């Protein structure tokens, strides 16, 4: 891989300075409002941001589109006092504005299709009217620096100044690693507790947390980025704590991989007059045999089974009082079925011991030939 040279580093520094200047002009301190019927609550804001994230995947749009849509929505909600019943219309209008700003012409969704498939409850004309209101309130200025823009810049600076970072990612390329961080950032943008920080602070906190896992000199890299961005270190520490807590709760909320342990059920074999064994299943339902083949169908969830000593069938005559009811494992019974249908050609005796002493102890002949001494020619 060709690492960026001094000119590329200067270009990254210029982009960072330009983005910070742009953010300082647009960003407003988020003032938490009391939940009421006249104001959009923080939970309602998070729900509509998560809805926009689903629309981003539904219409296969860029992450930059979602980042710009959420930034436009937050800027608009910080400027005006919006009623909650108009929140979906405001959000879909910001989403459509972001798509027209970021996406190529052929990737921009048709307005009628967007209004229909998003189930926003708004018509195309209502979305267009809300678009005009949003543009007027934002002074027709949609080119704002999003947290995703800062994430791209910080990640590029980290890769260019710390080449050893690439060796810490043996299975991921820099672009794939950036995609993983992008997904985490999109989740953090749906958290209203992180609105108190600027987008640059949020992106730097995520990069700092990730560098802490990968390289030993992550602290020096964080200080360098902090000085270039001209941020407060105390705010960065507080933002790191909130981001780490949010990502930890996000990972703990994911469904775990279920592991099922199969425990075979016990069956009782009753001997009849003619030497025929009749199988009496236990009261707990066990595995069946499919109609297509003779192999058992393993149940999805195994259940603990116990030995059930069932009485002999009425048609069977008990010839001896000393005769005991023989019990067989289900696996042994399956082996007998396989032999009956000539399915024992599979090598299942790999782990068997071929010694004669062991076969004598077990009371049966070993399928392997006896060991012979090696004769020296």
UniProtKB/Swiss-Prot annotation:
Biased composition (Pro residues) is annotated at: 367-377
Question: For the region Disordered, what residue ranges are annotated?
Answer: 357-377
Q: What broad class describes the main subcellular location of this protein?
A: nucleus
**UniProt tissue specificity:** Highest levels in adult heart, brain and skeletal muscle. Lower levels in adult placenta, lung, kidney and pancreas. Also high levels in fetal brain and lower levels in fetal lung, liver and kidney. Also abundant in testis and thyroid.
Tell me one GO biological process term: spermatogenesis
Under Pfam families, the record lists: Cyclin_N
- Subcellular location as annotated: Nucleus membrane
One GO MF term on file is: cyclin-dependent protein serine/threonine kinase regulator activity
Keyword annotations: Cyclin, Membrane, Nucleus
Name the InterPro entries for this protein: Cyclin (IPR039361), Cyclin-like_dom (IPR013763), Cyclin-like_sf (IPR036915), Cyclin_N (IPR006671)
GO CC, alphabetical: cyclin-dependent protein kinase holoenzyme complex; cytoplasm; nuclear membrane; nucleus
Whether Nucleus counts among this entry's keywords is yes
Which family, according to UniProt? Belongs to the cyclin family.
Name assigned to this protein: Cyclin-I
Biological source species? Homo sapiens (Human)
What is the organism lineage in this UniProt record?
Eukaryota, Metazoa, Chordata, Craniata, Vertebrata
- What gene is this protein translated from? CCNI
